[in-house]
């Protein structure tokens, strides 16, 4: 399935494809 956003941002970056940092949590683009 598609990766799920929601990890904590690390130095302003998200490592899950299609996610962006909405500090402090990654959100779907």
Curated annotation (Swiss-Prot):
<comment type="similarity">
    <text>Belongs to the cyclotide family. Moebuis subfamily.</text>
</comment>
<keyword id="KW-1015">Disulfide bond</keyword>
<comment type="function">
    <text>Probably participates in a plant defense mechanism (Potential). Binds to and induces leakage in phospholipd membranes, particularly ones containing 1-palmitoyl-2-oleophosphatidylethanolamine (POPE). In vitro, displays cytotoxicity against cultured cells but no hemolytic activity towards fresh erythrocytes. Not active against Gram-negative bacterium E.coli ATCC 25922 or Gram-positive bacterium S.aureus ATCC 25923 up to a concentration of 64 uM.</text>
</comment>
<feature type="disulfide bond">
    <location>
        <begin position="9"/>
        <end position="21"/>
    </location>
</feature>
<keyword id="KW-0960">Knottin</keyword>
<feature type="cross-link" description="Cyclopeptide (Gly-Asn)">
    <location>
        <begin position="1"/>
        <end position="29"/>
    </location>
</feature>
<dbReference type="InterPro" id="IPR005535">
    <property type="entry name" value="Cyclotide"/>
</dbReference>
<feature type="disulfide bond">
    <location>
        <begin position="5"/>
        <end position="19"/>
    </location>
</feature>
<protein>
    <recommendedName>
        <fullName>Cyclotide mela-7</fullName>
    </recommendedName>
</protein>
<keyword id="KW-0204">Cytolysis</keyword>
<feature type="disulfide bond">
    <location>
        <begin position="14"/>
        <end position="26"/>
    </location>
</feature>
<dbReference type="InterPro" id="IPR036146">
    <property type="entry name" value="Cyclotide_sf"/>
</dbReference>
<dbReference type="GO" id="GO:0031640">
    <property type="term" value="P:killing of cells of another organism"/>
</dbReference>
<keyword id="KW-0611">Plant defense</keyword>
<dbReference type="GO" id="GO:0006952">
    <property type="term" value="P:defense response"/>
</dbReference>
<dbReference type="Pfam" id="PF03784">
    <property type="entry name" value="Cyclotide"/>
</dbReference>
């Amino acid at each position: 399935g598609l990766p799920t956003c929601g990890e904590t941002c690390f130095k302003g970056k998200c490592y899950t494809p299609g996610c962006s940092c909405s500090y402090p949590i990654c959100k779907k683009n």
